[in-house]
Swiss-Prot record:
Highest taxon of the lineage: Bacteria
GO molecular function terms listed in the Swiss-Prot or TrEMBL record: bis(5'-nucleosyl)-tetraphosphatase (symmetrical) activity
Signal peptide: none
Keyword vocabulary terms for this entry: Hydrolase
Entry's family note: Belongs to the Ap4A hydrolase family.
The protein's name in its UniProt record: Bis(5'-nucleosyl)-tetraphosphatase, symmetrical
One Pfam family in the UniProt entry: Metallophos
Tagged with keyword Hydrolase: yes
Catalytic activity: P(1),P(4)-bis(5'-adenosyl) tetraphosphate + H2O = 2 ADP + 2 H(+)
Enzyme class of the recorded protein, top EC level: hydrolase
Enzyme Commission number(s) of this protein: 3.6.1.41
Gene: apaH
Function: Hydrolyzes diadenosine 5',5'''-P1,P4-tetraphosphate to yield ADP.
Length: 277
């Protein structure tokens, strides 16, 4: 496929900054470009419905992976979870085209690989190489796209198991895959996921490291592109790129052109306090 790839961080229902970003001369002038979204298209911001409609209308120019807030929307629509006070999903749930939007969303991938870049919402476990990540993501994708997708969503909540075993089955297997791809931030050096600690980057207790610094990570030979971690903010290394720059918290919405790492950002209005996921 021709054209540049612009990868965009967590939008979280902030449609005005998204429109401004896509209209930026550097991006709008790149007429053959394609767009990768690193998940969390919806929630916490005021315009989740408009965001979904806009990105859905981009058609084949857009690749969006599922984030934890996107999965939460699916669960709320399915009746598996009730929206919380901080959620801003009612407009989507009550929309006349809700069925179409939900069907589009549940057919999004959990991982995407192209041109040496692996995009996920949150991260990958150290034992997983690209092929295994895509295969395991595919297991969950198949469940979400099938006729029993509502039942599949019932299995995804919980922090355990926190480590991967090839012989995990059923709900345990699905939870580990979803938690790694959409929720992970910190791990022990042996790769045990840790969800209780929520502190500023660099202030985490001894014995915890960011998932991407777990020793011998099997994806270190490619570049993993992710969002999810607004307090970490913009991070660009040869092996990892974090693009969650806290749009909904009053930070910025960021887009990065992958082939030359050209960065474009637009400032965002603060809609909520940065005290959630």
């Amino acid at each position: 496929m021709k054209g540049s790839i612009w990868t965009i961080g967590d939008v979280q229902g902030c449609c005005a900054p998204l429109a401004e970003l896509l209209a930026h001369p550097e991006i709008a002038g790149d007429t053959d470009s394609r767009f990768w979204f690193a998940g969390d298209l919806v929630n916490r911001g005021p315009q989740s419905l408009a965001v979904l409609r806009r990105i859905m209308a981009m058609g084949e120019r857009c690749t969006a992976v599922l984030g934890n807030h996107d999965l939460h929307l699916l669960a709320a629509y399915a009746g598996v979870r009730k929206p919380s006070k901080s959620d801003t999903l009612d407009e989507v749930l009550q929309a006349p085209d809700a069925v179409d939007l939900i069907d589009w969303l549940r057919f999004r991938p959990l991982a995407h690989y192209e041109a040496g870049h692996l995009m996920v919402h949150a991260g990958v476990l150290a034992k997983w190489d690209v092929a295994k990540t895509l295969a395991l993501a595919g297991e969950v994708e198949q469940a979400l796209r099938g006729p029993n997708w509502r039942k599949a969503l019932q299995k995804m909540y919980g922090n355990e198991p926190a480590t991967w075993k090839d012989d995990h089955t059923g709900g345990k297997r699905m939870r580990v895959i979803i938690n790694a791809l959409t929720r992970i931030r910190l791990c022990t050096p042996s790769g045990h996921m840790e969800f209780a600690t929520k502190v500023a980057p660099g202030a985490w207790p001894a014995g915890l490291v960011p998932w991407f610094d777990v020793p011998n990570r099997a994806t270190r030979d490619v570049t993993v592109v992710f969002g999810h971690w607004s307090t970490l903010g913009l991070l660009m290394r040869p092996d990892v790129i974090c693009l969650d720059t806290g749009c909904v918290w009053g930070g910025a919405l960021s887009a990065l052109r992958l082939h030359d790492r050209k960065l474009v950002q637009v400032k965002c209005k603060r809609f909520q306090d940065p005290n959630g996921d």
